[in-house]
Amino acid sequence: MKKKILHHTSIMIIFAVLVTFLAASVVTYSKLNTYMQRGVREEAQYICLAMDEYGDSFLTKKLRTVSSSRVTLIRKDGTVLYDSEASPKKLANHSDRPEFIQAEKNGKSESIRYSETFAKKTFYYAVKLDDGNVLRVGKTVDSIYSTWISSLAVLGLLMLLVLIPVSYTHLTLPTI
């Protein structure tokens, strides 16, 4: 009888831990994604201010040392003038990118889509500059699945910490 109760209790504990872990992962992913997007928008605004002050010369290779985001300057016709991650000469015309098209129309835009350069889902924020060019800042977005997988080791350790004492107690208790 005690074995059966302990077995059911262990299953309930494992189930509760898994449900809590999944719920916490979803909430954490959502919050981190929101903070990342806000950070990209703010970074784009800071770069715009610096470009107003220093011109396009602000966009140098040194920008990579202070920013983990991908920064791209795109001419009105879609030609890439600067990219912090790839040579502009190797990049295709960006006039068909959704964030570029919307920034041209509305002054600013954002999109989440697959990036050929990063080979990952990427959040882009684009701003139309006074000279007609478009500044685009992008950051890769981990999927909730990859976030969950990377946390599985921690979950496994926590489950061991819970199950070992329960199992030890069960094995060392005298049976009556």
Regions from the language model: what does each represent?
Residues M1-V80, E85-L91, S146:
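Juxtamembrane segments flanking the first transmembrane helix
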Residues T169-T175:
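Conserved small/polar residues in nucleotide/adenosyl-binding loops
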Residues E53, K90-D131:
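Membrane-proximal, non-catalytic sensory/regulatory domains of signal-transducing membrane proteins
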Residues R70-T72, T122-L129, G138-T140:
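Structured catalytic cores of enzymes that bind and process phosphorylated ligands/cofactors
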Residues R41, N93-R97, S151:
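Short, conserved loop/turn and helix-capping segments at secondary-structure boundaries
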Residues L49-D52, D130-L155:
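Helix-start (N-cap) segments at beta->loop->alpha junctions
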Residues S150-Y168:
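Selective recognition of signaling/oligomerization transmembrane alpha-helices
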